[in-house]
Amino acid sequence: MLAFFVRRLASLIIPRRASSRFATALILLGTLAAPAFAHETLKLDAPKPQLAPTPPMGWNSWNKFGCNINEALVRKQADAMAASGMKAAGYQYIVIDDCWQKSRDDNGNIVADPERFPGGIKALADYVHSKGLKFGLYSDAGSLTCGGRPGSAGHEFQDARQYAKWGVDYLKYDWCHTGTRDAEAAYTIMAKALRESGRDMVLSICEWGNNQPERWAAPVGHLWRTTGDIYDAWEGKKDWSHGMTNILDMQVERWRHSAPNAWNDPDMLEVGNGGMTTTEYESHISLWAMLAAPLIAGNDLSTMDADTRRILTNSDVIAVDQDPLGQQARRVWKEGDLEIWARPLKGGEHAVVLFNRGKAPAAITVRWDQLNLPAALKADVKDLWSKKVAKNVRGSHGGTVASHGVIMVRITPVL
């Protein structure tokens, strides 16, 4: 017990971005007092498993359902992912967000809410796995989760072992009720716990970009949030949440910090939740694909309409997101409400989005020199939404872009 209290003391007295050496010293003091916890230091002995060579794809319960979740709902989402074409398109994780927890038992083990999840988490994970999918859970680095359920602070290794027994493949780890804990130290402890659990698990760092995760998160987690939560709107701010284009603007300079197995995460998709138009949802997923963002659907998969399914399963757009080169797009041009975003792809190809934030249709053209390509280069240009292909294009490519819309193309040099 002394080890636990010393570790908690460290989390309370060390300010954010403070020296991790001091944190390590305090935690080691606690471990010396209790040899059973001697492995609970900040040092990551095991390398980060290569579980996300491309951005993770899946579904998460929070955007649509919040705390209104239960076992039957999650099973229904798994059924829909497997049957709707989502699984075939590359989506694989079913992630239960906050409010699945109820309490801890007398031994400190985390207990699922028995009314919402009467069959238990292990049986639910087994069901998801039976569909050829992977299973994810949520926890928090604080004493409580954002929804007021038990957090993992002081129980990191115990919880990680429990997750492994249940068959968890993915952990979203939030940042509520953390007081003055140092984010790097807190997430490193959970990363170490997961790596020592005996099961590979993706670690999704969710501290909202408040603690400069681009400086420390790459060796620790597989993806890290860059902003507060998204909400289902074209633009705006609501409490700690941001509209889609507001979050996009926060990604402009982050391309330097994204790479395979270490992804910037601008938060989940809102496609199909009703707060934006079909055109805006096409822009949403197109821009997230350009950002090499995790594609985590946040709608009700069991009731989605044909347009939502079409948008979420566009194989050409998904292929850009999942390109193995893993380079996040840069905004290479902006004039008023008009923008061009571009990213190189493996094999010398390029993906480009012509983006119109304005209230009226507008002409936008990308020049080859903006892509560091010679003007004389011939290329085939495929529109990833209309599926039309322009052959042997030289120098530039453009079109009229709808209000709040995109033209997204893949440019393939003709050899």
What are these regions (language model features)?
Residues W288-L291, I296-G298, K334-L373, H404:
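Carbohydrate-binding surface patches
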Residues H155-Q158, R195, D200-D300, D321:
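Glycan-recognition surfaces
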Residues P55-S61, G90-D97, K134-S139, D169-D174, ...:
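Structural recognition of the beta-strand scaffold that forms the well-ordered cores
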Residues H39-E71, R75, A80:
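N-terminal module-boundary/linker segments of secreted carbohydrate-active enzymes
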Residues A23-A33:
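Bacterial N-terminal signal peptides
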Residues Q77, M81-T180:
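Aromatic-lined carbohydrate-binding/catalytic grooves of carbohydrate-active enzymes
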Residues F5-A25:
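Bacterial N-terminal signal peptides that target proteins for export
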Residues N392-L415:
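C-terminal beta-strand-rich structural cap/linker in extracellular carbohydrate-active enzymes
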